[in-house]
Amino acid sequence: MGGREWAMLLALAVLWGGSFFFNGVAVRELPSFTLVWLRVAVAAATLLLVLRLLGLHMPTEGRIWAAFFGMGLLNNVLPFALIVWGQHQIASGLASILNATTPLFTVLVAHLLTPDEKLTRLKAAGVAAGFAGAVLMIGPDALGGLGTGVLGQLACLAGALSYAFAGIFGRRFKRIGVTSMATAAGQVSASTLLLLPVMLLVDHPWTLPALRATWGAVVGVGLLSTALAYVLYFRILAAAGATNLLLVTFLIPVSAILLGALVLGEALLPRHFGGMALIGAGLACIDGRLARFLFERHQKRVVHGSLEGFDPQI
């Protein structure tokens, strides 16, 4: 990835890390499926309006809309339903660690299903270091719950696997010439339609009291953490591939913890710094440029040392 893609990845991590703040406010008045439906509905309305104001049009071909619905299913509906159900069976810390397996699944799925995102030793080492860093930041004590709630754990892992397949599936939109903004609008529009019956059946929103203090949080999570975030998501996917894109899963805990320290005054613990260091090392391994630079520097030293010991008169 180049500097532009890294900048977009960091911005995406900040937007998704910030969703914890918005969700923390919104869940006081809204059940889970109603909140996520409002989130994608606000994002869909916003992106469709922006496209209209820019004079751009959504695709009308049936095959493209079928792909939008497939993307919405893999990237929103299935993982959300699985993870929400799983979190009712296991502790939230363990659920966060299991969610951090997304890049692990992605490198494996990409290796099997794509011709250009093959697994290398350096990439495997980077993903392992990133996962270890995420575990350290969240707190290794959360792993103590591994012995219980097996079905909940499997549900969270299935959600992470769904995100991995979504990353691979979403590569097709660049191939068929759909822009990042149109793809983001199509996915959240499809997700809005897919989640509507689930939300009505599970949450019975007509029984909820009128919202008082959460509209700002709903709009914030819809505009920033969904609409803008998914435009960046599909731009990174088109430019850098699924494996690099889903490294954002390692950066979200970093973003959330730093935002908590800056905005809410939460304490930064030594394990947070250790986790950030491991995640940084993992990302550097996956990026590869630092490793190539060090290898080339070592090679130059070896060659230079050989020439110093060489006497042309012998």
Predicted regions and their residues:
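Specific transmembrane alpha-helical segments of multi-pass solute transporters/efflux pumps
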Residues: 15-23, 48-99, 135-136, 222-240
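C-terminal transmembrane-helix exit sites in multi-pass transporters
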Residues: 49-58, 103-128, 254-273
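Hydrophobic transmembrane alpha-helices of multi-pass small-molecule transport proteins
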Residues: 47, 69, 109, 121-141, ...
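Juxtamembrane helix-loop-helix junctions in multi-pass membrane proteins
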Residues: 14-45, 85, 91-93, 165-190, ...
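Transmembrane alpha-helical segments that form core, pore/gating elements
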Residues: 47, 106-108, 112, 144-203, ...
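Juxtamembrane helix-entry segments on the extracytoplasmic side of multipass membrane proteins
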Residues: 1-6, 29-33, 37, 60-66, ...
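Helix-helix packing/entry segments at the starts of transmembrane helices
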Residues: 36-38, 76, 95-101, 169-192, ...
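C-terminal-most transmembrane helix of multi-pass membrane proteins
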Residues: 38-44, 49, 214-216, 250-314
